[in-house]
Each structure stands twice: as structure tokens, then as C-alpha cells.
Design a protein with these regions (language model features):
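A structural signal for beta-strand and strand-to-loop patches characteristic of beta-rich domains
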Residues: 1-182
């Protein structure tokens, strides 16, 4: 632990063991707790393809007062996940030949209304070369008048396609770890 009055910033820890030197960068930060309760409602279930998202963002101060007029934004990062369906446990639905890394994208940027709410309407820009199911991580920030912000993170499953094709490989020879063919 660090002392409450310890200086913040980026520090470097160095250790010399034998003739080898090791260095590790450490970030010491002051952590501010959230002062706003944030609720992002995009409905239930899996987000499908490039279907427009419609939802509601709501925020209120932890004291119970509405967060009227505060600025807010939602950033989404999409990452690959393993595709599984409970009825088809023996099948592989992910394409190992496809690589995917998603860039962050803004879903919303604006101000909350007098009730501390905002309507969310947007589309996730999904790549056509996704290897299978994806996870969308929503980072919602609501900014206080002084510039500090509270943050909330949600993760939802995303199906980039309406239909999936799976392969079921034969069991093969487990002793030699290979498929037997005629």
C-alpha cells in the first residue's frame, strides 16, 4: 500500500539480482470513486449484426438528485470470443484463419436531458471478417461540471452474422492424435 500523501505519477522500480538488472514501470494514481450512478439499458439478449441499437442512458447523483444537463459519452470496444451453442457442443463455429482486433468507436456523445437521461441510437460498425461471436465492452462516462467523470462498464455478446456454420470433426485416433481416413 502507499501512503495517502504519496506523490503520484509514473515510477520505475529497478532490481539487480546477480549480474542481471530488472526494471518495471509502476503507475501510482489517485483513485476517485464514482459520484454518479450510471445505467445503460440496451435491452436483453445478444446484439445481432449491424442492427441499429436503441436504448436509454440514465444517470443520477449518488445523493439521489438528477444529473440534468451533464455531458456523457459511450465508447465501445469489440473483441473476439469463442462461439458456442448449447445444442451443438461438438461443433466448431469459429474460423481460425481470421484474425480480428477492433478499434474503439463512439456510440454516443451528448448531454443528458432535464431528467438525467438520453436516448441512444446507433450502429456498431462490425467487420465482415469476424472469426465468430464477439464481445462488446461499453464504457459509459458521465462528466461532472468540474470535469471529473464517473464511469460504468458493461459487456454484451454480439453475433456479427444472422447465421453460423459449424464443423464437427470425427473423433479420430486419440492414441496418435490424428484423423483416420480411407
Amino acid at each position: 500500500t502507499t501512503a495517502a500523501d504519496a506523490p503520484t505519477g509514473t515510477w520505475t522500480a529497478r532490481a539487480i539480482l546477480g549480474g542481471t538488472s530488472f526494471a518495471k514501470t509502476l503507475k501510482i494514481e489517485t483513485v476517485m470513486p464514482n459520484r454518479l450512478k450510471i445505467d445503460l439499458d440496451l435491452g436483453d439478449g445478444t446484439i445481432v449484426g449491424n442492427v441499429p441499437l436503441a436504448g436509454k442512458l440514465g444517470a443520477q447523483w449518488l445523493s439521489g438528485a438528477t444529473a440534468a444537463g451533464l455531458k456523457a459519452d459511450i465508447e465501445v470496444r469489440v473483441t473476439p470470443s469463442t462461439t458456442r451453442f448449447s445444442r451443438f457442443t461438438d461443433y466448431v463455429f469459429d474460423d481460425p484463419a481470421r484474425q480480428f482486433s477492433g478499434d474503439p468507436q463512439k456510440l454516443f456523445e451528448g448531454a443528458l436531458d432535464a431528467n438525467g437521461e438520453a436516448r441512444i441510437n446507433g450502429v456498431l460498425n462490425l467487420p465482415s471478417d469476424a472469426p465468430g461471436m464477439l464481445n462488446a465492452s461499453f464504457a459509459t462516462r458521465v462528466f461532472e461540471p468540474g470535469g471529473a467523470f464517473s464511469i460504468n462498464r458493461n459487456t454484451r455478446a454480439v453475433a456479427p452474422f444472422e447465421r453460423f456454420v459449424g464443423l464437427r470433426l470425427p473423433k479420430g485416433d486419440s492414441a496418435r492424435d490424428m484423423l483416420m481416413t480411407d
